[in-house]
Amino acid sequence: MKELIPYFPALLMDFCLGIVITNTAYFSTSLSLSATFIGVLMSFSTLLFTLFAIPFGKLSDRIGRSRLLSAGCFLITLVSLGLPQCQKGWHLVMVYPWVGLSQALFWPTYEAWLAERQGRGTLIQRLRLFNLFWCSGITLGPVMSSYLQRSPNPDFPFYLVSGCAVLNWLLISRQSELTSADLHSTSDHVLDPANDRPTHRPTLFIYISRIANFASWFTLSILRSLTPKLATEKMGVAPTEYGHFIMLMGSVQLLIYIWYGSKRSARWHYKLPPLFFPQAVTAMSLFTLGWFYHPQLWMIAFALFGISTATTYFSSMFYGLVGNTSKGAQAGWHEAILGIGVLLGPLIGGWLADLSNNPQSPYLLCGGLMSSLLVVQVGIWLTMRNSNKTDQPAQ
C-alpha cells in the first residue's frame, strides 16, 4: 500500500478537475450562458495550460518538483472557492481560467516526478498505475458532480474540490525530495534488459502518437465540457445518464491501461495497427453520436472512445518518456500538445453548436477531425518509417 501513495495525487487532482469542469458546465445553465461562451471560457483556461506546461516542466527539472506541485494544489483550491460566488458571465471569466494554470503547474511536474521514482516496477508498470489512478479520478469527478445536481445545494461539489485539493497538498508535502539513490537510470527498460526496442522508430512513433492524442483530447474536451450542458439542456438527457456514459468510458479506459501495463502489450509497441485501428473505429462511432441519440448507441460509442483515448494517451506518454533524460521537458510537450486539443475542442465545438443550432454537430466535427488526422498519421508513417531522421530524438 505504501508504494501506491505517490499515485494518489493524480487521482485527487483529476477528481478535482473533473468536478470543476462538469459542475461549471451545469452551473452555466443557471446563468443562461451559451455553448459558445462556455467553449471560449474552457479554451481560455486551456490556453494558459498550453502556454505554461512546457516552461513549468522545464522549471521543475531545475528547481525540483514539490514546489510546483504544491502551488498547483493551492491554486485549484482558490478557484474552487471562487466559482460558487460567480453571479455573471464575466465573473466566470475572471475566475475559471486559473484552472488551466493550476494544471500546468501540476501535471508535467508530477509526470516527470513519477517517472523518476524508484520502485519495484519498470517505467511501463509505473505508467500503468499512474494511468489507473488519474483515470479513476477524472471518471469519478464528473459522475459525482452529475449525481450531486440532485442535492439541495448544487454548488457543493465546488467545496468538495477545495477539501480534496488541500488533502492533496498535505499528501504531496509529506513526500520527501528525491535523492540520487531514488532515481532511475536514464536508460529506463520497458520490461527487461533484453527488451528489443527498434532503434529507428522512436521519433516516428512520438510524432504519430502525439497527433493521435491531440485528436483524442480535442474530442474528450467536448464530451466533458460541452456535453453536460448541450445534452441536458437541449437533448433532454438527465445528468445521471450523462454520468453513466462517463463512468462506462472511464471503466473501459482503466481496463485498457491495465492491458498496456502488462508484459503481453510489449508486442504492440512501435507498431502502427494497434494505434491506428482504435482511432478508425472511434471516428465512425463519433459520426453515430452526431446523427442519432439512442442511449445504447451512445454507450457503445463512449466505450469505443475509451479504448482509443487510453491507447493514444499511453502511447504519447510512453514513447516520450522511455529512455529520455529530459523527462520534465518531454512531459511538458506531451501535456502541451494534449492541451492544444483541449483548447480548440470546446472553442470550435461550442461555436458550431450555436451556429448550427444542433447540439450534436460537435460530434460530427470530431469524427471528421479524427478521420483526417488518421490520414496524416499514415502519411507520416509512409514517409519516415525507413528514414534516418527517425533516429534523432524528438522534442
Where are these regions (language model features)?
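A late C-terminal transmembrane helix in Major Facilitator Superfamily
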Residues: 326-356
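Transmembrane alpha-helices of Major Facilitator/SLC transporters
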Residues: 47-51, 244-265
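Structural signature of the two symmetry-related core transmembrane helices
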Residues: 67-81, 272-287
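Helix-loop boundary and gating motifs at the non-cytosolic
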Residues: 1-46, 206-208, 212, 217-235, ...
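Intracellular juxtamembrane helix-capping segments at the cytosolic ends
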Residues: 105-118, 310-324
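Cytoplasmic helix-loop-helix junction between adjacent transmembrane helices
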Residues: 97-132
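Symmetry-related core transmembrane helices of the 12-TM Major Facilitator Superfamily/SLC fold
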Residues: 156-173, 363-378
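Helix-to-loop junctions at the C-terminal end of transmembrane segments
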Residues: 53-64, 149, 256-270, 353-354
